[in-house]
């Protein structure tokens, strides 16, 4: 029973260690697993859509108070 409990805790520690890895390390590990299992490699471009647009500047909302509530401009 104690050996099984130790194995479960070591598995939990391994999962937590993997979750705390930086994204690049996790992606590299996932690629190593997929190549080891014979699966095709997926590039980062194929996973996420390309983001060619600059980040949108946040526009400060116009907060005019009206007796029923705030209105937007």
From Swiss-Prot:
Q: What is its main location?
A: secreted
Pfam families annotated for this entry? Somatostatin
| Chain segments carrying region Disordered | 23-58
Location relative to the cell: Secreted
Q: Which GO terms describe its biological process?
A: regulation of cell migration
Disulfide bonds, paired cysteine numbers = 62-73
Propeptide positions, renumbered to this chain? Answer: 1-45
Kindly state one GO CC term assigned in the UniProt record. Answer: extracellular space
Q: Which GO terms describe its molecular function?
A: hormone activity
Q: Keywords for this entry?
A: Cleavage on pair of basic residues, Disulfide bond, Hormone, Secreted
Q: Which domain of life is it from?
A: Eukaryota
Function noted in UniProt: Somatostatin inhibits the release of somatotropin.
The record's section on PANTHER family has: SOMATOSTATIN (PTHR10558), SOMATOSTATIN 1, TANDEM DUPLICATE 2 (PTHR10558:SF6)
**Belongs to which family?**
Belongs to the somatostatin family.
Name listed for the protein in its UniProt record: Somatostatin-2
Q: Which gene encodes it?
A: sst2
């Amino acid at each position: 029973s104690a050996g099984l409990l130790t194995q479960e805790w070591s598995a939990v520690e391994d999962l937590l260690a993997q979750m705390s890895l930086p994204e690049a390390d996790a992606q590299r590990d996932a690629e190593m697993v997929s190549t080891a299992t014979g699966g095709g490699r997926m590039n980062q471009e194929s996973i996420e859509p390309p983001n060619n647009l600059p980040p949108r500047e946040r526009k400060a909302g116009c907060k005019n108070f009206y007796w029923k509530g705030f209105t937007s401009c």
